[in-house]
Amino acid sequence: MLSNDILRSLRYTLKVNNNDMVRILALSAMESTSASFDTWTTKEDEEGFVRCPDIILSGFLNGLIYDKRGKDDSAPELALERRVNNNTVLKKLRIAFSLKTDDIQAIMSEQKYRVSVPEITAMMRSPD
């Protein structure tokens, strides 16, 4: 799945427009424009499609965490990942929406994905 697909899905799920997405990205100290988000949320087979860099998706997810949970000035800044995978996206969404393991399992089973609690905790572990 491309970063563009994830951004597009989040845009529709959160019911936000490009200006809101620029605002959320800015919370992670990154800059962009509404026009950039317009090209990043364009479907791959449509004219005007531009591939979204992973670091932008990472910044947007960090901004979403700050938007939903607030920024803790005593904590270090969230790291920007240059390579984003599905586990990273899931971890950041879990933090942003304060989801517990049971919540993730319920969401996955509602979407017809069979996943156990140990599998979810394994996905959330650091890759170290």
Feature names for model-found ranges:
Residues 1-8, 16-52, 75-78, 85, ...:
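A cross-kingdom feature marking solvent-exposed beta-strand/loop segments within repeated
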Residues 38, 57-65, 90, 121:
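Generic detector of well-ordered alpha-helical segments enriched in charged/polar residues
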Residues 48-70:
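Intrinsically disordered, low-complexity basic tails/linkers immediately adjacent to helix-turn-helix/homeobox/MYB/SANT
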Residues 62-114:
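Short, solvent-exposed interaction modules
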